[in-house]
Curated annotation (Swiss-Prot):
Other notes: Present with 656 molecules/cell in log phase SD medium.
Organism whose genome encodes this protein: Saccharomyces cerevisiae (strain ATCC 204508 / S288c)
InterPro entries linked to this entry: Rbsml_bS1m-like
UniProt protein name: Small ribosomal subunit protein bS1m
Broad class of the protein's primary localization: mitochondrion
Modification Phosphoserine, positions: 327
Length: 344
């Protein structure tokens, strides 16, 4: 059996389990189910790589499902791929996902090492610090874990003290306490430095481009990302009007240069029928998986601005073109040529 035949006959064995229903009507900030895509050639044969067959009436290339196989030999699925199209639209915009304001990027996170005794004492509680919104029960459990870890170091501490500071065994307890802090800090530091940093900034597969990267075009370097969108509605927030826009399948906060145009209020709900141009300022991924996007409305030119651009002088090119000969000279040359032919 060739590799192509093996891949053609292979089936999906397991995916991430999801207990949420396919027709979930609650508030969703991110896709909840994995999407399966098939190519047009395999869609004609109703081949999805699943254990059970899909009805022939399904014409969509994208499926979301919960169970690969049931007792009835049926896959619980829905022909829905809306999130897939949103991802493709976002990738076409080419906007990079940036970290939230005030949050340090873990890819360039600087892990400081304790240098003096005050930092050493603080590093003992590195494992106990955790998140700010941790519950008291979880903090108590973590404290119990750290206490058991410290007690397990008693024999090692005695050996370390005899080996490095044998004369300090006769000193008072205050001096001995400093050596305990030094020893525990050394043990905890060696363990925490080897631990892999699990805090990462995900992009949800929306974009893998880096911020600040230049994008070229036939007209030069692209400095701004301008995309079409539609004004949705106005939301009251802190006694101010907050305008929202639909851009690439996402809802973005609209920023104006000065103030919203007066025509927006007069158009009412019919404003959604008109398309405007927006400049994407920033797109970030929140902790709950939602995408926060800010865009600036590029207002159309008014009459004065359009008149100013029309009155600009048109500069002639520096390289002069060859002057064309008048048509009269061409006719005379043709007549002379005919006379020469007739004379021969």
């Amino acid at each position: 059996m060739t590799l192509a035949e093996l891949l053609g006959r292979s089936r999906i064995a397991q995916v991430a389990n999801n207990h949420k229903p396919l027709t979930y009507t609650g508030k969703k900030f991110h896709p909840t189910h994995q999407i399966i895509e098939t190519k047009p050639s395999t869609l004609y044969r109703q081949e999805w790589g699943l254990k059970s067959a899909i009805p022939s009436k399904i014409k969509s290339r994208y499926l979301v499902y919960n169970d690969l196989d049931t007792l009835e030999r049926i896959t619980t699925f829905e022909p829905r791929g809306g999130t897939q199209w949103n991802r493709l639209r976002f990738q076409e915009m080419g906007v990079p996902i940036v970290s939230n304001i005030g949050r340090q990027n873990p890819f360039f996170k600087y892990i400081s090492r304790p240098e003096d005794e005050s930092h050493a004492k603080l590093s003992l509680f590195k494992e106990m610090k955790g998140d700010t919104d941790i519950s008291p029960a979880a903090m108590k459990k973590r404290l119990k874990k750290i206490t058991a870890l410290i007690r397990s170091f008693q024999d090692e501490f005695k050996e370390w003290l005899v080996e490095n500071h044998p004369d300090e065994l006769k000193l008072n307890s205050n001096k001995l306490e400093d050596y305990v802090v030094k020893f525990l800090n050394k043990k905890l530091e060696t363990k925490t430095n080897k631990k892999f940093n699990t805090e990462i900034i995900g992009t949800g597969g929306l974009s893998y481009s880096l911020p600040g990267k230049l994008k070229n075009s036939p007209n030069g370097v692209i400095q701004r990302t301008v995309v079409p969108g539609r004004i949705l509605n106005v939301v009251k927030e802190n006694n101010d009007n907050k305008w929202l826009a639909a851009i690439g399948g996402f809802v973005a906060d609209v920023v104006f240069f000065q103030s919203p145009p007066s025509s927006f209020n007069s158009m009412g709900d019919f404003i959604r029928m008109k398309t405007f141009l927006f400049e994407i300022l920033e797109a970030s991924m929140e902790k709950n998986g939602s995408v926060s996007m800010h865009a600036r409305l590029l207002e159309p030119q008014n009459d004065k601005t359009r008149e100013f651009f029309n009155k600009r002088p048109i500069y002639k090119p520096l390289t002069s073109r060859r002057a064309r000969r008048p048509s009269v000279g061409n006719i005379q040359e043709a007549n002379n040529l005919l006379n020469i032919i007739k004379g021969n």
